[in-house]
Structure formats: structure tokens, C-alpha cells
């Protein structure tokens, strides 16, 4: 299902949904960040997705990362909560979500890279290289907040 993101755009459609979601900032021993190329918006992103009923938020992180990348992970820290009502995601099925994203630092504990129906590439990329890719500004904010993390989560 394709989507269009709007940030601070008065032409954005009216919000009809809020779904808590997660992203994981995962770095390898070389400091590279685990990223995926999303099939729904054709952008590079952190692995993550929507919280399902009946699961803990930690289970959401683990499930989404495994589904989108093939890696097993454990959470280290909460690095940010993002609820900008001017960041709207419109899906082709008519759902129009307000952003509600919780970001976590995590580390791999197993698995290996594989793509999914939501990700056609899985790559470890430097922060500098991400600046050269098509990455949504909200993802860069989450990455930068995580890289600057000093013990207090960003609330934006």
C-alpha cells in the first residue's frame, strides 16, 4: 500500500487515524546504521512500523525489525517520542495518520539481512551517506536524536 507524507502542508488531508509506531536505530561495530529502502514511499528509512494489539512495545520493535530486515534485536534505550500533528501520512486505502512514533536504540542478537514486502533493500549505511540518499526528514531527526542521546529521550 503506497503512502504520501505531508509535513507542515496545509493541503494535507484530514487525519482519521493515530497508530502508535516504532523505529529502531541499530548500529553495527563499525558505527553504520541499519536502514531499509521502503516500498510504500520509495525512501530510505529505519526499520519499524505499527504497534499491533496484544503486543508490548518491545515486541513491536523486535517484530518489525525482523519482518523488514531479517535481524533479531533487543532494545537498549528509548531515544525519542514524535507526535507532530502536522506530519500526516495518507495511504491509498483512505487511512490518513497523524505521526506517532517511538524511537529506540537497539542492537542485533542474531539473524541476517533479508528483504520483505515492505523493504526492497537492507543496508548498513553511515550517517554521512544517508544525507546523500532520499530519506524523509523525520527519519533523519530520529537518527540525529539517537546519535546525540545522552540519557534523556527527545520529545517532539
Predicted regions and their residues:
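A structural signal for short, well-ordered beta-strand segments
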Residues: 24, 78, 104-106
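Acidic, metal-coordinating catalytic segment for phosphate/diphosphate chemistry
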Residues: 1-23, 94-95
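Short connector loops at helix/strand junctions that flank enzyme active sites
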Residues: 19, 41, 46, 73, ...
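A short coil-to-beta-strand element that immediately follows conserved catalytic motifs
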Residues: 72-82
